[in-house]
């Protein structure tokens, strides 16, 4: 006979979007949803474009945000994509949302396909991620720095970035 306090119930991590992707044959790894209850899914860079295209065809027609972050020295560089279904919004119904994450080995190939062909709004967002973290977006029509000078060395938001000792100050006059 077991005590009720000893029963361990495994929490199901996968959500409806992860299940839908799996049923369509797309490899994905569901992660714990974020603090807002948004489903978070890990995908490989090779599957990014086809998965986002499938999600767009299923109604996720707005790329709310694309960005990156550094997990720390020696760890991954992560690209994330927040997709939303923007249709007729009703006050009592929240739109469907999903966050996709692509984990890249910082010492490996930091290339992912560009989403510019699906979402024109990815243009500057991908350029910023390139500029700050060094992620290359294959197929991007304007692959150049956005915030830093073209001759800047390194990726300033990486946690292993070594700051240069000298900055040339430009007079505004």
Swiss-Prot record:
What GO cellular component term, any one, is given? plasma membrane-derived thylakoid membrane
Principal localization reads membrane
Q: Identify the enzyme class.
A: translocase
The compartments listed are: Cellular thylakoid membrane
Q: What is its EC number?
A: 7.1.1.-
Which InterPro entries does the annotation name? Answer: NADH_DH_suC, NADH_quin_OxRdtase_su_C/D-like, NADH_UbQ_OxRdtase_30kDa_su, NADH_UbQ_OxRdtase_CS
A Pfam short name: Complex1_30kDa
Q: Which GO terms describe its molecular function?
A: NADH dehydrogenase (ubiquinone) activity; quinone binding
According to UniProt, the reaction catalysed is: a plastoquinone + NADH + (n+1) H(+)(in) = a plastoquinol + NAD(+) + n H(+)(out); a plastoquinone + NADPH + (n+1) H(+)(in) = a plastoquinol + NADP(+) + n H(+)(out)
Q: List, in alphabetical order, the GO biological process terms annotated in this UniProt record.
A: photosynthesis, light reaction
Membrane topology of this protein: Peripheral membrane protein
| UniProt xrefs under PROSITE patterns | COMPLEX1_30K
Keywords from UniProt, A to Z, are:
Membrane, NAD, NADP, Plastoquinone, Quinone, Thylakoid, Translocase, Transport
What biological function has been recorded for the protein in this entry?
NDH-1 shuttles electrons from an unknown electron donor, via FMN and iron-sulfur (Fe-S) centers, to quinones in the respiratory and/or the photosynthetic chain. The immediate electron acceptor for the enzyme in this species is believed to be plastoquinone. Couples the redox reaction to proton translocation, and thus conserves the redox energy in a proton gradient. Cyanobacterial NDH-1 also plays a role in inorganic carbon-concentration.
Q: Which family does it belong to?
A: Belongs to the complex I 30 kDa subunit family.
Query: Subunit comment for this entry?
Result: NDH-1 can be composed of about 15 different subunits; different subcomplexes with different compositions have been identified which probably have different functions.
Per its record, how is this protein called by name? NAD(P)H-quinone oxidoreductase subunit J
């Amino acid at each position: 006979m077991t005590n009720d306090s000893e029963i361990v119930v495994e929490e199901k991590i996968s959500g409806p979007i992860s299940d839908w992707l799996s049923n369509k044959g797309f490899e994905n790894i569901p992660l714990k949803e974020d603090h807002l209850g948004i489903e978070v899914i890990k995908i490989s860079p090779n599957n990014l474009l086809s998965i986002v295209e499938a999600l767009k065809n299923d109604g996720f027609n707005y790329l709310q945000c694309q960005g990156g972050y550094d997990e720390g020295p020696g760890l991954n560089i992560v690209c994330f994509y927040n997709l939303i279904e923007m249709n007729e919004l009703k006050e009592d119904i929240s739109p469907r949302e999903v966050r996709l994450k692509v984990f890249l080995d910082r010492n490996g190939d930091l290339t992912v396909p560009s989403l510019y062909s699906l979402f024109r709004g990815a243009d500057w967002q991908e350029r910023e991620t390139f500029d700050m973290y060094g992620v290359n977006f294959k197929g991007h029509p304007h692959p150049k720095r956005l915030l830093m000078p073209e001759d800047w060395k390194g990726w300033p938001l990486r946690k292993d970035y070594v700051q240069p000792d000298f900055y040339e100050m430009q007079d505004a006059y």
